[in-house]
Amino acid sequence: MEDIARVNLYGQPVGTFRWDNNRQLAHFEYAESFIGKGLEPSPILMPVRQGRIYSFSDIGRETFKGLPGMLADSLPDTYGRALFDRWLALTGRSSGNAVETLCFLGKRCMGALEFEPAMDAPYGPDVRIELDSLVEVASEALSEKEEFGANLEEAKKAAIAEIVRLGTSAGGQRAKAIIAYNPSTGEVRSGQIEAPEGFDYYLIKLDGVTAEAGFRETQNFGRLEYSFYQLVKECGIEMSDCSLIEENGRAHFLTKRFDRQNGEKIHMQTLCGIAHYDYRNPRSYSYEQAFNVMRALRLPYSQAQEMYRRMVFNVVIRNQDDHTKNISFLMDRQGKWTLSPAYDMGFAYNPKGGWTAQHQMSINGKFDDITRQDLLEFARHNNIKEATEIIDRIAEVSSRWPLLARECEVPQPMIDAIMPNLKLSI
């Protein structure tokens, strides 16, 4: 079991962290060689200081696993963690600490942080990936059957190891994988190796992944998410290029990775990680706090207006899964911070559900029943110009969502169930 690990960023050592087994806590210190580089990978709570040791015992154990937020952002989320736990079971290992998890990921994390020493998780050959097999193996890897792995042939074990490599670094709850994709040929390869010519890095959300046996039919989430991507673009909100890959009646949602540019890694921090705003504590934070973080990162006014546009969109289309991991920031090699492109911008509302019955972050002190006046008050307090025009445009464009949804082949019953919940008259 690993207790000490090194952190690298942009080809240079950032620091070292040690696991305190008694306190179940990591202690991080910046490398002396990193001090004076002019880079601040976590400037709000972990500014670069010589001799300063960072540890945080008062933040959520379930989310941060005893790590500082800067490092915890690299941990797998619900789906990735499930894959990792199944891989541990398959290989006869016990669940390790957070340091061991990061060493397993090594250079395969989202963003640009890399961890050493890397565990024995080989990248696998650069071969073409068949999506139908990926869906099947992902479903088997998530199976809760006790006999999982007991009688698997070596070929299937290797396939499951591959989906673990492709899926553990991706965040969120839905089944997904990190891939290299060639839009011209439609060919899919592993996203954990250097992308061949003509390929770029994408995240694919797999349609039809279940823990049940037999053919996995479409659940239409890919088509639904793609229809909202189209709506996001029409509202003038920045989002990475997205598309659908269809096979066997299923539609997998594909989004270009914004933490990779021209094959280079880009350092990324979520609002959760950079400010320790625990996304598992619903209705504990506000959009006002997000704007305060943006000011601390010295983001320009244009990005504040962009964030306001996203906030209004979330209200109008009832994206109430708007938690602190669904806002991210990017830092380039010169240390300049920017707001990342938007992601996970779709309908998420269940009046009977504990999570999405209300917004996760408040606006003008409210998590529910947010009005136009609340949006205008927010704009006034945060010096956002043209707020009325932004609200009007997003409401008007969103009224055309059913047309976009039908063009994306979203089933009519799904459209009919969603449409009455949109706040088009705000």
Predicted regions, residues:
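Phosphate/dinucleotide-binding and metal-coordinating scaffold of catalytic cores
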Residues: 1-324, 328-426
